[in-house]
Swiss-Prot record:
Catalytic activity: Hydrolysis of proteins in presence of ATP
Motif extent (Microbody targeting signal): 850-852
SMART domains: AAA, LON
Lon N-terminal domain location: 13-222
Tissue: Widely expressed, with high levels in the liver, kidney and pancreas.
Gene Ontology terms: cellular component: cytosol; membrane; nucleus; peroxisomal matrix; peroxisome
UniProt-recorded name of the protein: Lon protease homolog 2, peroxisomal
Family: Belongs to the peptidase S16 family.
Native source organism of the sequence: Homo sapiens (Human)
Its EC number(s): 3.4.21.53
EC category: hydrolase
Cell compartments where the protein resides: Peroxisome matrix
One Pfam family in the UniProt entry: Lon_C
One MF annotation (Gene Ontology) recorded for this entry: enzyme binding
Length: 852
């Protein structure tokens, strides 16, 4: 007797090619569709079809679809599964694709592929029919025994699970309600099997063969459950329910034939993770949190989104260096040598590092200081932080804070958010692997602020030695000790740093370099570095110190050495071109007449000194080594000089004075120009001035008007009222640059005094200081940078407030020798020093008055 399955499929089916899994009759699978042919199938057949027949597909397993429909169709698997598309979900991220929920109906065999584009369609033959066995009792008994044996193992497997779980109870009812012929396919799709084993079950057309192949799979799962029950400790009822819901996915098979290696490796990783938690040296609070999270992780299916989040959290917790630290090198003599070799000058900074080492020798549990290096760009603030770590023998990590405007970058995100991650502090500790590194917080003065919070406020806890031993990152949600971390912040100015944050840091000023210091730095560090980067040797290029001085004074004007480094790099590139061309010419000369070449070389070598690069421009022979970089070579390589000493030319008429200004880039000289014309007594100020500088200008003109008779200052009409029918225009050149601050007061007074007296201000004098309405000169900041700017500009005398005299101690000795300093407490002293011959009080012969 034979019977045919009631499921009838069309004789022609569109084919869905998949390699992610194997769909068996009676089971349901979710698959992603993103290849060209499969996308065409979904769009043309499923989304536009209106009949039930249009939703039936032929699913071909173990067959990847080519990415492009222009490629040939790969060899198709012989047996497939007719499936009903139950659900179609589309998405455009990260690329256009569909997710299909399909239910297997029956097996089929491909008879012939009818067409391949836009999607394959094949003529198929249905295979799932009830077979007619030979009419012998032996065969019937054999099939009956296989069926009973299969059913017995299936029931035994289900009864080992918790029947109170609805999913298990439903599976038990299915065993009693479904035909025995359908159970092998359904149970194979439920229990833990590999794709290869499912493919073998799919290819088993004979029902007897499917029974024989499925029974060993059931036995394996039963043995695995027994082993799990023996080795697993008693759990709470909730644990049993979770095991019962996903019983087969969690057991480890013992036959060794399972090829689902990803899940095995994942389970092994969880075991290793649990072992790391037990053996870690994290604090008790963190350990409790990890134990709680690992218990939750074991209960979760791997398909849950929270599974990956929890696992990432636990991996971070075991990787953090809770108690792992490096041993400090406390040899002060060796540290001094190392700092001197790495950096020239910076005596104040080196002194502070050596003091820290000395205190560490006396007290081992000293908390790390919070240092902040403040200075112009290019003076080596970042590199000196690396040298400090090298000196101490610690790990170094740099955190760039420029432009950071989200406090979560410091404190991390809470784990409730999608894509949450720890902050930069915790990430840095994970990277270095120790709990006492040197952290460089670069550009702390350029932190931003946004709706996501203020990162500067988040740094208050990090940079407070009294609080950072219990720093709590939002992602970790447990305290981490940062007290052993040596934090070094860098900034160009303290003006933009919040006061609360500034109060927590020890400020160390790193001023700009003098010309002599730049020359030493260039020949000790910059030139050797550039030679190495460009593949040159000292035997190929010679840069005298006088050439370096020319580069510093005529091609760069900065407090640091970055521009100097770039200019030296340009020189090395030009020399590299000459050297490479010379090698090419030598190769040509080797093939020419040797006698002629020797004669030419004797002619060229008449002068044995190193030749300049400009002398070798038109030679047919390779240049002689070393190539000398002189003034002419600089002009050929770098072009005409960018800066000239034009101070004396700009002070060739009255009404011009030189002031000194401080910027985040270092000190600068600043010209002040004044002119007068007939008018209505108005004061015009130009040059992008701030409110403070405008007030200084009004103060200056008021003081001069009140002392005009004393100094015999008159306007063009001979009146002591300087603004009577007279307009004054004050201009500060470099109008595109915003200027503000009180230190230009003395310069404005001197400029206006020169204008109304008709006398020239000395061209070699610069000045700085704040003024009052009574004519007092008040102290200002940035004296060292301002003095260095005057020295760079070639000036000879600097006028500063008397109360700033103490700041001259930080000026290098060679600069103090080149400059003379005048300390002034009032404007009378300033004017006397600014003009040749002084600016003494003038008196007119008094008129004889009589009462008669």
């Amino acid at each position: 007797m034979s019977s045919v399955s009631p499921i009838q499929i069309p004789s022609r089916l569109p084919l869905l090619l998949t390699h992610e899994g194997v769909l068996l009759p009676g089971s349901t699978m979710r698959t992603s569709v993103d290849s060209a042919r499969n996308l065409q199938l979904v769009r043309s057949r499923l989304l536009k079809g209106t009949s039930l027949q249009s939703t039936i597909l032929g699913v071909i397993p173990n067959t990847p679809d080519p990415a492009s429909d222009a490629q040939d169709l790969p060899p198709l698997h012989r047996i497939g599964t007719a499936a009903l598309a139950v659900q179609v979900v589309g998405s455009n991220w990260p690329k256009p694709h569909y997710t299909l929920l399909i239910t297997g109906l029956c097996r089929f065999q491909i008879v012939q592929v009818l067409k391949e584009k836009p999607y394959p369609i094949a003529e198929v033959e249905q295979l799932d029919r009830l077979e007619e066995f030979p009419n012998t009792c032996k065969m019937r008994e054999e099939l009956g025994e296989l069926s009973e044996q299969f059913y017995k193992y299936a029931v035994q497997l289900v009864e080992m699970l918790d029947m109170s779980v609805p999913a298990v109870a439903k599976l038990r009812r299915l065993l009693d309600s479904l035909p025995r012929e359908a159970l092998p396919d359904i149970l194979t799709s439920i229990i833990r099997t590999s794709n290869k084993e499912k493919l073998q079950i799919l290819d088993a057309v004979s029902l007897e063969e499917r029974f024989k192949m499925t029974i060993p799979l059931l036995v394996r799962q039963i043995e695995g459950l027994k082993l799990l029950q023996k080795t697993r400790k008693p759990k709470q009822d909730d644990d049993k329910r979770v095991i019962a819901i996903r019983p087969i996915r969690r057991i480890t098979h013992i036959s060794g034939t399972l090829e689902d290696e990803d899940e095995d490796e994942d389970n092994d990783d969880i075991v290793m993770l649990e072992k790391k938690i037990r053996t870690s040296s994290m604090p008790e609070q963190a350990h409790k949190v990890c134990v709680k999270e690992i218990k939750r992780l074991k209960k979760m299916p791997q398909s849950m989104p929270e599974y990956a989040l929890t696992r990432n959290y636990l991996e971070l917790m075991v990787e953090l260096p809770w108690n792992k630290s490096t041993t400090d090198r406390l040899d002060i003599r060796a540290a001094r040598i190392l700092l001197d070799n790495d950096h020239y000058a910076m005596e104040k900074l080196k002194k502070r590092v050596l003091e820290y080492l000395a205190v560490r020798q006396l007290k081992n549990n000293l908390k790390g200081p919070i240092l902040c290096f403040v200075g112009p760009p290019g003076v080596g603030k970042t590199s000196v932080g690396r040298s400090v770590a090298k000196t101490l023998g610690r790990e170094f990590h740099r955190i760039a804070l420029g432009g950071v405007c989200d406090q979560s970058d410091i404190r991390g995100h809470r784990r409730t958010y999608v894509g949450s991650m720890p902050g930069r502090i915790i990430n840095g500790l994970k990277t270095v692997g120790v709990n006492n590194p040197v952290f460089l917080l670069d550009e702390v003065d350029k932190l931003g602020k946004s709706l996501q919070g203020d990162p500067a406020a988040a740094l208050l806890e990090v940079l407070d030695p009294e609080q950072n031993h219990n720093f709590t990152d939002h992602y970790l949600n447990v305290a981490f000790d940062l007290s052993q971390v040596l934090f070094i912040a860098t900034a160009n100015t303290t003006a933009t740093i919040p006061a609360a944050l500034l109060d927590r840091m020890e400020i160390i000023q790193v001023p700009g370099y003098t010309q002599e210091e730049k020359i030493e730095i260039a020949h000790r560090h910059l030139i050797p570095k550039q030679l190495e980067q460009h593949g040159l040797t000292p035997q190929q290029i010679q840069i005298p110190q006088v050439t370096t001085l020319d580069i510093i004074t005529r091609y760069t004007r900065e407090a640091g050495v970055r521009s100097l480094d770039r200019k030296l790099g340009a020189i090395c590139r030009a020399v590299a071109v000459k050297v490479a061309e010379g090698q090419h010419k030598e190769a040509k000369l080797d093939r020419s007449d040797v006698t002629e070449r020797e004669g030419c070389r004797e002619h060229i070598l008449e002068d044995e000194k190193p030749e300049s690069i400009s002398d070798t421009t038109d030679l047919a022979l390779p240049p002689e080594m070393p190539i000398l970089i002189d003034f002419h070579a600089l002009k050929d390589i770098l072009g005409p000089p960018m800066y000239e000493m034009e101070v004396s030319q700009r002070l060739s008429q009255p009404g011009v004075a030189i002031g000194l200004a401080w910027t985040p880039l270092g000190g600068e000289i600043m010209f002040v120009e004044a002119s007068r014309m007939d008018g209505e007594g108005q004061l015009t100020l130009t040059g992008q001035l701030g409110d403070v500088m405008k007030e200084s200008a009004h103060l200056a003109i008021s003081w001069l008007r009140s002392n005009a008779k004393k100094y015999q200052l008159t306007n063009a009409f001979g009146s002591f009222d300087l603004l009577d029918n007279t307009d004054i225009h004050l201009h500060f050149p470099a109008g595109a640059v915003t200027k503000d601050g009180p230190s230009a007061g003395v310069t404005i007074v001197t400029c206006l005094a020169s204008l109304f007296s008709g006398r020239l201000v000395r061209s070699d004098v610069a000045m700085t200081g704040e003024i009052t309405l009574r004519g007092l000169v008040l102290p200002v900041g940035g004296i060292k940078d301002k003095v260095l700017a005057a020295h760079r500009a070639g000036l000879k005398q600097v006028i500063i407030p008397r109360r700033n005299e103490k700041d001259l101690e930080g000026i290098p000795g060679n600069v103090r020798q080149d400059l003379s300093f005048v300390t002034a407490s009032c404007l009378d002293e300033v004017l006397n020093a600014a003009f040749d011959g002084g600016f003494t009080v003038k008196t007119r012969p008094g008129l004889l008055n009589s009462k008669l």
